[in-house]
Amino acid sequence: MKKYILTIVFLLAAELIIKAQTADPLVSKCVMNAGENTRYLKDFRVQLAKGSPSEELRYKTQMSLWKNTKYRFSMCNSEDSKGELILTIKDNTNKVVLSSYDQKSGKIYPFIDFICNKSGIYQLNFDFSEAEQGSGVGVVSMVR
């Protein structure tokens, strides 16, 4: 009897584990685009309605980054997004350290590499170009 109960418990646990690992296709695509020499750390799903263009990016989150570590930030858009996902990284003094949007050329990069020179909490600010509506994901990876 114990054997049957253990088998049922094991099967139920296995089913829960398999269902929990169902990945978002957009996240999977973005992780694969980060490159073979990277290790996935975290993803941020961003979904925003159309806003008014301003200097401030609308989706803000924080992440702890470590000194002497190279990070890759990859941005991917869903097919129905009207704008392209943009990322700006700020340090603890609110100074912009790096951005995927080059204001001079107007170019938006699909990924940016960042070598952290100081451990600490960094603010990650996301938005879509021209404050358009969109859905996307930002993936943080460590470059080996």
Model regions: which residues?
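Noncatalytic modules at the cell exterior or secretory-pathway interfaces
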Residues: 114-132
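Non-catalytic extracellular/lumenal accessory regions of secreted precursors
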Residues: 21-59
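Extracellular and analogous surface-interaction loops
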Residues: 59-69, 113-119, 144
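Bacterial Sec-dependent N-terminal signal peptides
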Residues: 1-25
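Extended, low-complexity, turn-rich repeat/linker tracts enriched in Gly/Pro/Ser/Thr and Asp/Glu
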Residues: 77-85, 130-133
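Edge beta-strands of jelly-roll/beta-sandwich modules across compartments, strongly enriched
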Residues: 130-143
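Hydrophobic beta-strand segments within beta-rich accessory/binding domains
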Residues: 60-78, 123-127
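Short, surface-exposed beta-strand/strand-loop-strand elements in extracellular ectodomains
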Residues: 80-96
